[in-house]
Amino acid sequence: MRRTSVLVTIAFLAGFALGLVARSAGMGMLQQRTHTADLAAIEKLHQDEIRFTLSQDPKGLMDFWAEDAVRFMPGSPPDVGKQAIQATNEKFHAQYPGLKVLSYASKFKDVQIEDGWACELGEHESQFKLSPEAPPTNWKGKEFHVLKRQSDGSWKVAAGLVSQ
C-alpha cells in the first residue's frame, strides 16, 4: 500500500510540474501573440500619421490622439486634451491656409510595451511650403511618444514631446 501511494504521489507531482510548464509555455505564446498584435497596431498608427500629415486631413490628424492626450511643442505651452490639440492645429492652419506638405517620413525605434502602455522615440523629416509662393522648407525633428492601448486594441498617443 505504501508503495502505491508513493507512486501515486510521484505521478501527481510529475503531472503537476508538466502542467505548470505547459501553462507557462502557453502564457508565453499568448504574450508573444499579444506583443506582435500590439506592434502591428502601433505600426498602423505610424502609417496613419504619415498619411494624414501628407494630406493635412484635419480629422485624420486628430484620430491618433487619445481624448486626454498632452502635446508638448517647442516654444509653446502644452496642449492638454484632444480639443486643445485640435484648436492649436486649427489656429496654425488659419495662419497658413496655403500650407502644403511635400514630403514626410518618420522612423520610430525603441518601442517598449508594458501593460497597455508603450513609449517610443521617433525621428521625422519633412519638406513643406507655408504658402504656394513660399520656397520649400526642410524640417527635421525628434519626438517622444507615450502610447495607450484602446479598448478595441488600437493605440493612440497619450503624450507627445516634439523637439527640433
Regions found by a protein language model. Give the residues of each.
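Beta-strand elements of well-folded, non-transmembrane domains
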Residues: 126-130, 147
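Conserved glycine-rich acetyl-CoA-binding loop
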Residues: 133-134, 153
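N-terminal Sec-pathway targeting helices
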Residues: 1-11
